[in-house]
């Protein structure tokens, strides 16, 4: 049994809770950024760095709430260094304590079986008639036949089991796990739990627990069943009284069959009366309790605790599933972003490509502006996505594919990629991209990570040089970690001459790029190699023209 008194309590909760207090069950991916509601990631960055694909790659969670928590950690990462450190402490405890890991796995698997029933209770709509166990359509409204009795029994039993199983977990060392388990145990002391555990009494339209009910007040408890013994007993007593009354009265007239006729006529009234009672239960008990349970912060917190434990197990299992080195980054609390990684591999490719070429990442105070040059298809974009995805995984508190890593959490991550112009905004590509860069610049701080895939495209060379130079100098003075991918080696030479920035280029051998980044500035793009590989070289164009009618010599 867990100690009821938490020590070293930390603020690990994020609001609002995932369990919605509305009438609709939230989707697993509902926490993705929106134009009007952004966090560390904006919408464009979220899409550009393939966050959904990253979730699919690392997701090993078994519960709906666990997957929702994990997705939120990626879509809306925290930049609280202390919280990430505590989360890592819990992951280390899982790795060091196989017995605890096994106990938590059993706990989550036990909860998976009944988790769905809780959501059916909280968000179900009941249409009467014959009861159904599964909703008609799980993607929209959770509509069921019946009056919600079955869902009430199973859903409340899940809540009871959650508390009992959590209380039976072995002691834990890490403050993060201790707080999660304690939240579930504490839910057992709440009024919501008392109502879910039962019995429930309805007095003057209000719900009372066994402790709240006046001791000597004879009030029947609510029974989630179509068969109500007290109403049935009253009805049978009335029918029996009428039967004997008419039977005796008509017996004096020699018409004893009249009593049997009355008895037969009353039988069809039984299901009508039961239906009326069930409809009353649904409107006056089930739905009001459903609303009360949905709005319970104690229940939402307990369910979220289950999800956060499942998330930890998922991060642990992901690390075990990848061949090669995996590490928990050292999390630093500082006023300026930094990221240093040894032998970094791309999180989306590390598992399926064991021979993936690793690269080091060094983004610190001395390397705050990094400019990457090199041939097309040489690995520049993959390197940039590796940087951002490792930063993102680090800010979930989880493992990253590398030998060693150290990072300061970023409060903003921006990734700008080339986009076409917007006709509805009346601007071409150059103006559209410049507007994006402007928004990124004015929202950046020293704790920001900014990646610009090309800059000031769509204008003359001279204007591009001037604009790119003052924009990059602006980011450098701002203190944001800034990475530019470009073919503009003249810009690199100009900034390098002023001692601004560090420079990497794609290593290129006679047989092609190695996908390794080395110091230096590339002066060639090897576009001819890419064109030849795609079958669109000068020779390919000439051969095609020669095959056209009237073009053959």
Regions found by a protein language model. Give the residues of each.
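Short amphipathic alpha-helical segments with heptad-repeat character
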Residues: 275, 289, 293-296, 300-303, ...
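Conserved amphipathic alpha-helical "coupling/scaffold" segments
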Residues: 1-231, 294-300, 305, 327-329, ...
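Charged/polar positions within long, soluble alpha-helices
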Residues: 96, 161-164, 168, 238-245, ...
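Structural signal for well-ordered, non-membrane alpha-helices
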Residues: 92, 307-310, 438
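ATPase nucleotide-binding head domains, primarily ABC-like/P-loop NTPase cores
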Residues: 262-274, 312-553
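Transmembrane alpha-helical hairpins and terminal membrane-anchor modules
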Residues: 217-287
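Transmembrane-cytosolic junction motif
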Residues: 1-11, 273-293
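Transmembrane helical bundles of ABC transporter permease domains
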Residues: 283-324
């Amino acid at each position: 049994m867990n100690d009821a008194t938490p020590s070293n309590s930390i603020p690990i909760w994020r609001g609002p809770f995932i369990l919605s207090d509305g009438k609709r069950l939230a989707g697993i991916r509902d926490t993705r950024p929106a134009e009007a509601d952004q966090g560390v990631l904006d919408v464009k960055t979220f899409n550009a760095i393939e966050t959904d694909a990253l979730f699919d790659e690392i997701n090993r969670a078994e519960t709906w709430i666990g997957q929702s928590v994990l997705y939120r950690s990626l879509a809306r990462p925290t930049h609280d260094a202390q919280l990430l450190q505590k989360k890592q402490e819990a992951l280390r405890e899982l790795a060091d304590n196989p017995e605890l890991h096994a106990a938590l796995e059993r706990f989550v698997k036990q909860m998976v079986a009944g988790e769905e029933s809780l959501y059916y209770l909280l968000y179900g709509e009941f249409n009467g008639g014959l009861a159904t166990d599964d909703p008609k359509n799980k993607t929209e409204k959770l509509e069921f036949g019946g009056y919600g009795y079955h869902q009430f029994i199973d859903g409340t039993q899940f809540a009871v089991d959650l508390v009992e199983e959590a209380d039976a977990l072995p002691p834990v060392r890490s403050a993060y796990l201790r707080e999660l388990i304690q939240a579930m145990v504490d839910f057992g002391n709440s009024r919501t739990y008392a109502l879910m555990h039962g019995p429930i009494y309805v007095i003057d339209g209000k719900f009372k627990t066994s402790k709240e009910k006046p001791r000597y007040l004879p009030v029947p408890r609510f029974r989630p069943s179509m068969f109500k013994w007290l109403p049935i007993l009253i009805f049978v007593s009335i029918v029996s009284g009428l039967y004997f009354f008419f039977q005796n009265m008509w017996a004096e007239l020699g018409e004893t069959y009249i009593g049997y006729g009355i008895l037969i006529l009353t039988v069809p009234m039984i299901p009508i009366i039961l239906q009326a009672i069930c409809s009353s239960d649904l409107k006056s008990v089930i739905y009001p309790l459903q609303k009360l349970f949905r709005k319970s912060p104690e229940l939402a917190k307990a369910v979220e605790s289950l999800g956060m434990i499942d998330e930890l197990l998922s991060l642990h299992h992901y690390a075990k599933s990848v061949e090669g080195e995996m590490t928990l980054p050292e999390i630093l609390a500082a006023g300026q972003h930094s990221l240093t990684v040894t032998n970094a591999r791309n999180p989306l490719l590390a598992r399926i490509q064991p021979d993936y070429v690793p690269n080091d990442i060094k983004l610190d105070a001395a390397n705050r502006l990094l400019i990457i040059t090199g041939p097309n298809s040489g690995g520049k974009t993959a390197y940039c996505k590796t940087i951002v995805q490792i930063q993102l995984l680090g800010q979930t508190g989880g493992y990253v594919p590398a030998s060693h890593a150290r990072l300061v959490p970023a409060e903003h991550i921006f990734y700008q990629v080339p986009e076409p112009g917007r006709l509805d905004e009346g601007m071409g590509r150059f103006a559209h991209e410049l507007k994006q860069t402007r928004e990124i610049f004015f929202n950046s701080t020293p704790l920001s990570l900014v990646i610009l895939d090309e800059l000031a495209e769509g204008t003359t060379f001279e204007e591009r040089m001037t604009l790119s130079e003052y924009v990059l100098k602006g980011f450098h003075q701002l203190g944001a970690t800034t990475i530019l991918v470009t073919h503009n080696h003249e810009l690199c030479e100009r900034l390098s001459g002023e001692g601004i920035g560090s420079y990497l280029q794609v290593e290129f051998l006679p047989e092609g790029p190695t996908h390794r980044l080395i110091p230096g500035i590339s002066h060639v793009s090897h576009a001819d190699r890419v064109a030849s590989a795609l079958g669109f070289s000068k020779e390919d164009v000439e051969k095609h023209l020669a095959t056209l009618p009237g073009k053959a010599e």
